[in-house]
Each structure stands twice: as structure tokens, then as C-alpha cells.
Amino acid sequence: MNFILFIFIPGVFSLKSSTLKPTIEALPNVLPLNEDVNKQEEKNEDHTPNYAPANEKNGNYYKDIKQYVFTTQNPNGTESEISVRATTDLNFALKNDKTVNATTYEKSTIEEETTTSEPSHKNIQRSTPNVPAFWTMLAKAINGTAVVMDDKDQLFHPIPESDVNATQGENQPDLEDLKIKIMLGISLMTLLLFVVLLAFCSATLYKLRHLSYKSCESQYSVNPELATMSYFHPSEGVSDTSFSKSAESSTFLGTTSSDMRRSGTRTSESKIMTDIISIGSDNEMHENDESVTR
């Protein structure tokens, strides 16, 4: 781009030098050039480095396009703007010599015409921010330098974790409610199983106790026939002696309750025999008493 400007500016100088070149009479403030001024300019040119135009060989072709605008005051009292666009870094040396006013005036007028002759789409591009090229961003990423991001470059940023976690945060209350419901269901199931187990244990204990009570009653059963036969009725007119003898005979021939349980029929027969013997002995004693009284 600089190379094109360097070609374009000398052509404009050669075409319009007759019309734009002011005379010394028209510019009274301009002084003639001296040898000292030329020497100072040569020294300044020696100190200023020469920047080669950007091309593909030197690696500066993909640098950012920068625009510089300078305002200068003309001897007539008007101001002119100098606009420079370049793809490389520029260093400007400002000189405060009065002898250079003629050349600056010529340059300002030429650059004003060039800026007005530029198409409108270039002016529109100036207002938009300069987006760094892909290769410059890649080089800066490799070198480890910080890259300044513009508005358009924000599209390349990764999604922040806060935005990702926002959707997950909405689902967290649902998960918490589900966990609480599961815990309540498990606790209710355990309580129900405990109640069922307790009822089963109480029922089995009641049955075992009832069976043991029945077994005790079966061991000590009473035969009603034997109870009526062994029961003595004193109202039948038997004397005390016969009662005592019958008691002695019953004790002498008596049987225990265990013998009665073992053989129910044998005990009944023995009781009958003892009753018969006791009755016979009572009758004999009664007859003897009557004979003695006679």
C-alpha cells in the first residue's frame, strides 16, 4: 500500500506543480533554504530508520491497517488534515522550521484532494474497528503475547461456565425433591415390615402359650365317675367307727392319684372291693354289738 502511495504522490506533483506551487511573494513568511537546514535534514534522515514496504517476503504483510490523521495550520489561517493509512508501524519526525511551510502546504493540499477522490466505501471502512487477521492472532498465540479482542472477536470466546451451570441449577431442585421422596418411601417400607414382623411374633407367642396351657390341663384330668364313687356320704347312717375303719381300710388299700391315672379301670375295681369289704366289716361289727348288748 505504501508503494502505491509513493508512486501516486510524485505523479500528482509533476502534473499539478504549476498550479499548486506557491511563489515567495504569495507567502511572505517563507524564508529561503540555508545550508544549515539542509545539513540538519540530512542528519535527521540518517537517524530515522528506513522501513521497507510490507510484502509477503518480510513477514509484515498481515499487520493491522492503521490510520493516522494530522491537522496542520496553513499561513492563510486555514487548517488542513493529513490522513495516512499504513500496514506497518510508522515513525514521524516533526520539524519546527519555518522554511518547510511551503512544502507542507503543498503536501496538505495534495492529500486533501486524494482523500476527497477516494470512494465512499473506504470511508465507511474507516469507521469500523480493525479486526486482527487470523495469521496475526496465530502468531501472537504461539509467541504467548496477549491478544486484544474486539467486539467481533467475542464470538470466538468459549461459553462461560456460569451460563452452562445456569441450566443445571434449574434441575437441581427437582433432583433434591426426588431424593427426598425416595428416602421417605424407603423409611415407610421399613416401618411397614417392622409392624408386620411384630404382629407375627406376637401371634406365635400367643399360640405357644395356649398350647402349653392345654397340655397342663390334659396331664391332670379328672374322671367324674371315679369322683362320684370315691366320694363318701355320711348321711347314710354309718357310725363313726365304721367311718374310721373305712378310712383306715381306704388308706390301707388306698391308691394314689398317679395309680389312678395309669389304670382307670383297676382303680375303679379296687375302690369297689374296698367299699364292699368296708360294708361287710361294718355289718359284722354291728351284729357283734347287738349280741353284746343282749
From Swiss-Prot:
This protein's GO CC annotations: inner acrosomal membrane; outer acrosomal membrane; plasma membrane
Tissues showing expression: Isoform 1 is highly expressed in testis. Isoform 2 is expressed at low levels in skin and blood.
Signal peptide residues on this chain, from the entry's feature table: 1-14
Key words, A-Z: Cytoplasmic vesicle, Glycoprotein, Membrane, Signal, Transmembrane, Transmembrane helix
InterPro entries: Eqtn/Afaf
Positions in the Vesicular compartment: 15-181
Keyword Glycoprotein: yes
Sugar attachment sites: N76, N143
Protein name (database record): Equatorin
Name of the gene this protein is made from: EQTN
